[in-house]
């Protein structure tokens, strides 16, 4: 394991690793313990009591955070005709079909999210092996395979984030930047936590949310006690 820098070590001293903090305290600490010289991302991590190996315990979806993520997402839309015009009018960064499939096959990835109309998925499927490992493959569960391209582009630009449980039963998702006001980070966290609760698989047994923490890009993890706030 790489040796932690002096700033990180000093920041970590501010955190009691045995304690689960009030959510407001936790967010305050995230800002205090940030050691990056840039506007670092604040991330929430949820350790869940699910078995991702079982299809009925997979968790995947997307949610629009009330205060956005602080990052401008570059959107590529695969669509034709009127739907292509709709995507352009909505502010998509790139709109096309076979031309962009060829570019991606040649190693072009100057985008963050792909939206595709259902009739284009046969073509998009040709680059599935390239997109899949990068988490870029459009999926109906995240609202990125749809004929409602205007809505999809608008939501992504407004701060929509995708979430997916990993092989270890964890979900990691950005909830903003350290430059955000604490209240806005708390609101985003609450929205994400509420979304995770509602996504609980019926087949999940025992304790569902085992651990919750927040951290900045180069800061220490801070445990959160979700019972310290009410999620509507």
Swiss-Prot record:
How does the annotation summarize its subunit structure?
Part of the 50S ribosomal subunit.
Q: Which CDD domains match?
A: Ribosomal_L1 (cd00403)
Q: Name one GO biological process term.
A: translation
- Family of the protein in this entry: Belongs to the universal ribosomal protein uL1 family.
Name of this chain's protein: Large ribosomal subunit protein uL1
The record's GO CC annotations read: large ribosomal subunit
* Keyword line: Repressor, Ribonucleoprotein, Ribosomal protein, RNA-binding, rRNA-binding, Translation regulation, tRNA-binding
Q: Which segments cross the bilayer?
A: none
Alphabetical list of InterPro entries matching this protein: Ribosom_uL1_bac-type, Ribosomal_uL1, Ribosomal_uL1-like, Ribosomal_uL1/biogenesis, Ribosomal_uL1_3-a/b-sand, Ribosomal_uL1_CS
- Purpose: Binds directly to 23S rRNA. The L1 stalk is quite mobile in the ribosome, and is involved in E site tRNA release. Protein L1 is also a translational repressor protein, it controls the translation of the L11 operon by binding to its mRNA.
Q: Which NCBIfam families match?
A: rplA_bact (TIGR01169)
Q: What is the lineage of its organism?
A: Bacteria, Bacillati, Bacillota, Bacilli, Bacillales
Which GO molecular function annotations are given, in alphabetical order? rRNA binding; structural constituent of ribosome; tRNA binding
Q: Which PANTHER family has this protein been placed in?
A: 54S RIBOSOMAL PROTEIN L1, MITOCHONDRIAL, LARGE RIBOSOMAL SUBUNIT PROTEIN UL1M
């Amino acid at each position: 394991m790489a040796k932690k820098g002096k700033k990180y070590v000093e920041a970590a001293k501010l955190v009691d690793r045995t304690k689960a903090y009030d959510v407001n305290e936790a967010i305050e600490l995230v800002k205090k313990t940030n050691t990056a010289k840039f506007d670092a991302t604040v991330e929430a991590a949820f350790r869940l009591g699910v078995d991702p190996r079982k299809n009925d315990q997979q968790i995947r979806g997307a949610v629009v955070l009330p205060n956005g993520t602080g990052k401008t997402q570059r959107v590529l839309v695969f669509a034709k005709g009127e739907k292509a015009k709709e995507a352009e009018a909505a502010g998509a960064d790139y709109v096309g079909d076979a031309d962009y499939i060829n570019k991606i096959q040649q190693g072009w990835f100057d985008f963050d999210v792909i939206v595709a109309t259902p009739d284009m998925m046969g073509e998009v499927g040709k680059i599935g092996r390239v997109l899949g490992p990068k988490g870029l493959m459009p999926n109906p569960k995240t609202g990125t395979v749809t004929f409602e391209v205007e809505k999809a582009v608008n939501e992504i630009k407004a701060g929509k984030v995708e979430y997916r449980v990993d092989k270890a039963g964890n979900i990691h998702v950005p909830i903003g930047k350290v430059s955000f006001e604490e209240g806005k980070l708390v609101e985003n966290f609450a929205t994400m936590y509420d979304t995770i609760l509602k996504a609980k698989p019926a087949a999940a047994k025992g304790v569902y949310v085992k651990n919750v923490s927040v951290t900045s890009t180069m800061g220490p993890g801070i445990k959160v006690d979700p019972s310290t706030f009410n999620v509507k």
